[in-house]
């Protein structure tokens, strides 16, 4: 299990850089008695809390906390995020995030508009718009709120695409559970699995057919593009809410 949480700041001091904000969030977690012992080393963009690391491998889970700055206004973000699910306008949901590999701006830039942009709310809206589009079914079963709530109540009823993604992630976790820490870095990240599954999904009304179709077609959505900065062709999986962002950027490095 993994939980993705956005630590959203609705403003900042004018002199704060990405580094300042990232460290501020990290310090708050580090200074909390409950989180100090389970806080992992600083990640590229997130802080991670690891739960039950010494317990049963099947019961371990982690929470990724993404520091972000909202330059639009909190009320506007909420209004846009929870508006009509079929509205495919995502640009107003963009947040500015930290990235400690973007040198030197990570420790120098104080303008959030210049930082790396991310769109977790827009991505959730994109995903649910696809998941809710089941062949032969006109009634909307789920709301966007159920897809972005960080800790929703357990729901036994899920859409076929949601269940298929859960199974694919579980398969990944089991496959890599006995690998070394270095080899575990080769695991496909969750947003890659989710994106490829959603793009391959064709409105199947049951988990079996959905999973079969996704497994058969998901590879077709891995593109190849020429990266001028690396002077070579790289695998490319576009963020559907930001086509310039490559979810598979690590593949080119590794």
Language model features with spans:
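Flexible, surface-exposed loop/gating regions in the mature catalytic domains
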Residues: 4, 48-50, 129-133
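Amphipathic alpha-helical scaffolding segments
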Residues: 22-27, 82-85, 214-218
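Long, charge-rich alpha-helical interaction segments
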Residues: 99-162
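Conserved nucleotidyltransferase catalytic core and NTase-mimicking acidic/glycine-rich helix/loop elements
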Residues: 146-254
